[in-house]
A protein has these predicted regions:
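Outer-membrane beta-barrel pore domains and translocons
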Residues: 3-7, 134-136, 223-229, 269
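Extracytoplasmic gating/loop element in the C-terminal half of outer-membrane beta-barrel translocons
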Residues: 70-72, 81-84, 136-227
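Residues that define the transmembrane beta-barrel architecture of outer-membrane proteins
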Residues: 111-115, 194-199, 258-262
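Repeated loop/turn-to-beta-strand initiation elements of outer-membrane beta-barrel proteins
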Residues: 126-129, 210-211
Length: 270
């Protein structure tokens, strides 16, 4: 049996045409202060932030931006707030300032379609195998843990990818350099949350009994089951099917993945 579901929720009014009403605040920065929020005409689970455009690779990048004014950095030192190895963001209104006017809609946490597939297979006499898959297609997740473990700040427990951060010897990297605390909410930490999970497998076998044995025991069955046995995902975190906050959908702040469990049972029926 295959099930499919779709849910669409749009904000119709918040009292203002342009205002974003925050539902989850950025714990490490006040610009912008929110990551999730309600805005008229947008999904209920809308994600907001700056559009991350990598880092300044070389002086030529900085010089060319003097003409185009396409990008801007978060700290206003140097030419137009730029600096080699620092992150750059899309300057939406081309005013040379990184502020609320550059915050954009980064996607909805709601999946396009979700559901499951399950079936039971009877093999020979007494053996049955049941499988159950769940899935979610589309939608985005915000990896809040990257504000701590994927920034250039001098703090412990960094993600391995930070070994590839920008340096003079690695000038093509789009990961901000060490020593720069990149804690702004941006598209850098927004990921496709699609997944397919083998939720459970159940195997049962009924042992054949002779007529004589059935006078004492009517049935003996053995069972083996497992939960959360396999997960396919695009998300680089542990598991996109997690949530840290009860206020918003799909926010990962170092959440533990769903545990894998096994069970064995013997059933005797007299």
């Amino acid at each position: 049996m295959l099930t499919l579901a779709h849910n669409s929720q749009i904000v119709t009014s918040v009292g203002s045409e342009s205002e974003v009403v925050p539902t989850y605040l950025n714990p490490r920065s006040t610009s912008p202060q929110y990551i999730y929020g309600y805005k008229k005409g947008y999904p209920v689970d809308a994600i907001w932030g700056y559009k991350y455009e990598g880092v300044w690779h070389n002086d030529a990048d900085i010089a060319y931006n003097e003409i185009t004014r396409a990008y801007v950095s978060s700290i206003k030192t140097g030419a137009n707030g730029t600096g080699l190895g620092r992150p750059k963001y899309a300057d939406i209104n081309h005013d040379g300032l990184l502020d609320e006017n550059d915050v954009v809609f980064l996607g909805s946490a709601d999946p396009v379609v979700y559901g499951g597939f399950q079936n039971n297979f009877l093999i020979g006499k007494g053996l049955s195998i049941g499988i159950y898959f769940t899935y979610s297609v589309g939608g985005y997740i915000y990896n809040l843990s990257e504000l701590y473990a994927a920034s250039g700040s001098a703090s412990p427990n960094k993600f391995r990818k930070m070994l590839g951060a920008w340096t003079k010897d690695n000038p093509t990297s789009d990961i901000c350099k060490a020593g720069f605390d990149d804690t702004l909410a941006s598209s850098k930490s927004v990921y496709d949350a699609s997944w397919v999970r083998l939720k459970s497998v159940n195997i049962n076998y009924s042992i054949p009994l002779s007529s004589k044995a059935k006078k004492v025991i009517k049935e003996i069955s053995l069972g083996l089951s497992g939960d959360n046995l396999w997960l396919w995902k695009k998300y680089p975190g542990f598991d996109p099917d997690v949530n840290t906050s009860s206020a918003v959908f799909r926010l990962d702040n170092g959440s533990f993945p769903r545990s894998r469990t096994y069970a064995f049972n013997i059933q005797l029926r007299f």
